[in-house]
Amino acid sequence: MKKIILVLVVAPLLSFSQSKNIYGEFNFGIAVLDGGAFPGASFLIGKTNYYENNTLLDYQAGIAFPTIVTGKLGFGWGDEDFATIIGFRVWPSCPYIQISIKERHNLSFEYHIKNSTDFGQAEALITYGYRF
């Protein structure tokens, strides 16, 4: 039932956007662990829909190291020059905030609520992404 409601809410948003941008993104970052840090990287394909009221919907999915797959969905404020996005990463599950500059440079901060993943006790994740 929750999935149906989500589809009914998101589907109209996807079709009435002012502009759309499909992109590839390379990300690299550091997971903050109990005993230090661990590097990671991902390659994602995503889409950003910009709306007339200065809001946006950004979603992406792809391959990652060490989690193999990843994806995230975010809602934000801004335009192609500067945007702030708040969302949720599907795997590993965690909320995030992302700052996007000129649609190309993205900095995200993610906090693991349960402090654990299949790969250990991760507290947070800090990433930089470059879109092309």
Spans of features found by a protein language model:
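A general lysine-centric signal
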Residues: 2-3, 47
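Sec-dependent N-terminal signal peptides
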Residues: 3-15
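Transmembrane beta-strand segments that form the barrel wall of outer-membrane beta-barrel proteins
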Residues: 22-33, 54-66, 73-97, 105-115
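N-terminal targeting signals for Sec/Tat export/insertion, comprising classic cleavable signal peptides
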Residues: 26-52
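Membrane-embedded beta-strands of outer-membrane beta-barrel proteins
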Residues: 43-45, 71-73, 95-99, 126-128
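Outer-membrane beta-barrel "beta-signal"
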Residues: 119-132
